[in-house]
Structure formats: structure tokens, C-alpha cells
């Protein structure tokens, strides 16, 4: 340092000025480089954050989001459910009501007689004196064959010369046609068991020896759907009489394009509709704006905007799957605590109603849970995924704990997801619908069949009643 001072003292004034100007220029250049590096660092930080969020999205599966299980990568020993192990052994539990296929009045009895001679002393045995000591049954089906009824139109001529003709029954309109029971069976297999036309024609030929073309199957479906239209509308009426209704929608293929299959369902029935749209106009068209009960659903905007006078209940498993994602990917303590809180609220609701607590105590407990929820939602998130979820939950916080006020309202929308699952089964087997009418027809018939299941009715008998236009569901 002393050496530098001595050298500078030897320099002239002009030389010192040149050195200062040169250093100033170098400083300005370095500051410019620093500014460019800071901008580059800022850009790279944004890119890193975007890539981290993209990686997080790619790591989502059916356990940590609303994605279907079919989109999950193959993993060994992966738990796809939010349910915990119960600790019970598999199979029937002690005390459950037993069931048996044993028949009290068999169609045929075969006596398995012992030998006619004693194997010990050699004396003859009178088999008429034998007694039954044990029974075993074998269940079989009789040989299957088609049953053909021929209607012959008779004629007679009076002595005066007037010729009189008999009349065919009203339902016999063709020279050769399918009877109602056979039509019902075709509808049952195609809709309830999702058998495509080709496999259905093969099955009818193999089982019954009946050769049926695809057009005959389509005619049976169309006739049943047309005659079932009044009952189809009745299903929506009886659903809207219930205290709660669940709603959901999923994509399907119609004429090679993406359409949407909707469902509204309750304990009394299931209503399906097919539409090109996924917005609130579909709700107005099919569900209306006069529902008096509670609507259970995920957070899709069309459901959020649906008129439900008693309020909305958000599906907890949907929220919990997103919380599981935050726990798994971001190690988020807030998500863990909120997930635990939601599980506790579900148990608390059952407890305060099953243990006979007074209305005052129940109200106090519910208010405490609402206060705790508000405290959870005001905590600041540490990443964009958490902030997005918090923002949505804050907006819809009034519909997260609504179920606690009524023991009959579910905290989930699982029944709607089960109801809509058949659309995906249909898509995986058949790929979709070739026509709009085929899609609408399937929605009508599926509504009839799923409602019959919920009301404990025989599906085949229900389809026959729809064909004869005598079907009426309970509650409508």
C-alpha cells in the first residue's frame, strides 16, 4: 500500500485524472455486468420454480389428486385409497348375518343308498328302511333354448257369405319379432353389463341358438328408451325430493368428439344426462334452479353455482387428496394439520349425533370446528400449490363443514363418483358412442337400471315394466 502511494505521488495531475477516469469506466462496466447477472439469476430462479411446479404436477396420482387411477404409473404395493387399515381379518366378521345357496325344496332328490348286503356279517339289507343322515346339493341350470310363440290369424266364413278374421295381439306387429323378455335381456346385457353389439350377438347365438343382428339390438334399445321417457323424468323429480343430492360429471366420446356425461343421484335414484357442454347451462337444463336441499359435489364451478337452498357440501376426499399431494411433495405441515382436522370433523359429527348430545352442545361443537377452520385458512402458504388451495378453500369455506349440522348429509361425494364410473367402463370397452341419439339413449336406460338397483328391484323385471310402460318407482 505504501509503495502504491509513493508511485502515485510521482505522477502528474493529468496522469492521475486519467487513472481515475479509467477506474470509473471499469466500475461502470462491472456494475452493468452485475446488473445483467442479477437479471439472469432472477430469470433462472423463475425457470427453476416453474420446473419444480411442473415436476410436482407430473408426480400427482390418484392418491394425491382427482386424477383417475388409470392414469397412474405402474407402482408396486401402492395404496390408492384414503382409507386406513382396520386391523380386521379379511372375510366375514363375527356376528354378520350369514347367507347360503342351500335350497329347502330342491327340484330333484337322489337317494344315495348303501350296498344291499352287510359288509360285516353278510346279511341282506332292506334299503326301504334307510334314513337320510346327510345332504349335499348341486346347483345347475336347465338346458337353454329359445321359446317361439306363433300367432295364427284364423278366419271363418258365415253361411251368408261374410268372412270374419281374428285379430293379432296389439304388441304383435311384424311377421317375426322379438318378445319383450328377450328385448329386456338385450337391454340388460348391453347397458348394465356393457356388452358391445358384436359380443352380444355372439352370446345370444351361443347360449340360445338365436341369431340376432345388430340392428335388432339397437331397435330394442330405442324402443325401451322411448317408452321409458316418462319414468326418466320421474327419476329427477324423486331425486330432488331428497334432503341431499350428489352431482358429478366426466368426459366421454360422442361422434369422435369430447362430450360430458353428468349425473345427479341420491338414495332414491340416479339420473344421467349427456351433453356437449360442461357449464352451468347443463345444470339449468336438467337439474333446474329450484332444489331445496343440500348439493354434495367437488369444486367444479357449475356445481358451485347450482341453486341449493340448504347449501353446498364440498367433497372431503377431493380436498384430502390435494392435501396428501402437498404432504408428499412439499412436506407441508399445514396440509398435514388440515387433513387431520377434516378427519376429526368427520368423526365428531357422528359422535355428537349418535351419543344423544343436546342441540345446544352440538351447536357449540360445530361452532368450535368452524372457528378452527378459519384459523387454518388464514395461515400463509409456503408454495404456489398451497396458496392456490388456500385461496379456493377460503372462497368456499362455508361449504366445507356444512355436513356437521345434519347426520344424513355425507361429507363426501363418493356415491356420485361410483355412479359416473360406468361411463368410463363403457368407454374402455366400446370406445364411445357413434351417434348423439345412442349416447342419449344410454343415459336414459342407465338411469332406469341404476335407480332400480338403489330401490332393490330386479333389473330385468324393471326393464320389462319399462317396455310395457307400467314402471313406477317408489317416492315419485
What are these regions (language model features)?
Residues 3, 49, 154-157, 162-476:
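Catalytic center-proximal scaffold of phosphoryl-transfer enzymes
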Residues 1-174, 218, 247, 297:
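Short, flexible loop/hinge motifs at secondary-structure junctions
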Amino acid at each position: 500500500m505504501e509503495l502504491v502511494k509513493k508511485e502515485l505521488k510521482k505522477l502528474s495531475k493529468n496522469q492521475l485524472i486519467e487513472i481515475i477516469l479509467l477506474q470509473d469506466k471499469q466500475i461502470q462496466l462491472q456494475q452493468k455486468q452485475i446488473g445483467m447477472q442479477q437479471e439472469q439469476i432472477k430469470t433462472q430462479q423463475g425457470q427453476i420454480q416453474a420446473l419444480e411446479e411442473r415436476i410436482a404436477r407430473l408426480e400427482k396420482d390418484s392418491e394425491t389428486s382427482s386424477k383417475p387411477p388409470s392414469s397412474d404409473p405402474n407402482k408396486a404395493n401402492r395404496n390408492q385409497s384414503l382409507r386406513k387399515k382396520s386391523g380386521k381379518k379379511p372375510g366375514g366378521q363375527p356376528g354378520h348375518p350369514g347367507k347360503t345357496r342351500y335350497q329347502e325344496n330342491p327340484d330333484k332328490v337322489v337317494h344315495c343308498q348303501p350296498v344291499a348286503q352287510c359288509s360285516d356279517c353278510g346279511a341282506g339289507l332292506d334299503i326301504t328302511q334307510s334314513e337320510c343322515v346327510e345332504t349335499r346339493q348341486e346347483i345347475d341350470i336347465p338346458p337353454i333354448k329359445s321359446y317361439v310363440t306363433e300367432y295364427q290369424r284364423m278366419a271363418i266364413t258365415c253361411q251368408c257369405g261374410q268372412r270374419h278374421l281374428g285379430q293379432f295381439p296389439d304388441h304383435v306387429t311384424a311377421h317375426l319379432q322379438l318378445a319383450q323378455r328377450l328385448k329386456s335381456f338385450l337391454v340388460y346385457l348391453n347397458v348394465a353389463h356393457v356388452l358391445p353389439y358384436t359380443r352380444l350377438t355372439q352370446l345370444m347365438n351361443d347360449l340360445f341358438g338365436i341369431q340376432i343382428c345388430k340392428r335388432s339390438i339397437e331397435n330394442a334399445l330405442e324402443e325401451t328408451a322411448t317408452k321409458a321417457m316418462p319414468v326418466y323424468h320421474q327419476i329427477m323429480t324423486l331425486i330432488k325430493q331428497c334432503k341431499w343430492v350428489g352431482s358429478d360429471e366426466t368426459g366421454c366420446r360422442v361422434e369422435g368428439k369430447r362430450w360430458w356425461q353428468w349425473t345427479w343421484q341420491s338414495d332414491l335414484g340416479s339420473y344421467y344426462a349427456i351433453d356437449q357442454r360442461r357449464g352451468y347451462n347443463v345444470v339449468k337444463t336438467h337439474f333446474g334452479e329450484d332444489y331445496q336441499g343440500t348439493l354434495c359435489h367437488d369444486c367444479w364451478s357449475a356445481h358451485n353455482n347450482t341453486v341449493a337452498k340448504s347449501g353446498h357440501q364440498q367433497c372431503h376426499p377431493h380436498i384430502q387428496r390435494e392435501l396428501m399431494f402437498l404432504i408428499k411433495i412439499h412436506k407441508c405441515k399445514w396440509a398435514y394439520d388440515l387433513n387431520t382436522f377434516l378427519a376429526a370433523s368427520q368423526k365428531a359429527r357422528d359422535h355428537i349425533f349418535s351419543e344423544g348430545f343436546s342441540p345446544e352442545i352440538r351447536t357449540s361443537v360445530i361452532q368450535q370446528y368452524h372457528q378452527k377452520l378459519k384459523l387454518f385458512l388464514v395461515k400463509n402458504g409456503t408454495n404456489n400449490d398451497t396458496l392456490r388451495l388456500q385461496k379456493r378453500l377460503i372462497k368456499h369455506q362455508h361449504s366445507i363443514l356444512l355436513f356437521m349440522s345434519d347426520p344424513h348429509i355425507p361429507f363426501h361425494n363418493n356415491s356420485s363418483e361410483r355412479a359416473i364410473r360406468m361411463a368410463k367402463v363403457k368407454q374402455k370397452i366400446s370406445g364411445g358412442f357413434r351417434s348423439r341419439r345412442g349416447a342419449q339413449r344410454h343415459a336414459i336406460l342407465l338411469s332406469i337400471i341404476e335407480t332400480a338397483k338403489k330401490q332393490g328391484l330386479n333389473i330385468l323385471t324393471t326393464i320389462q315394466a319399462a317396455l310395457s310402460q307400467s314402471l313406477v318407482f317408489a317416492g315419485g
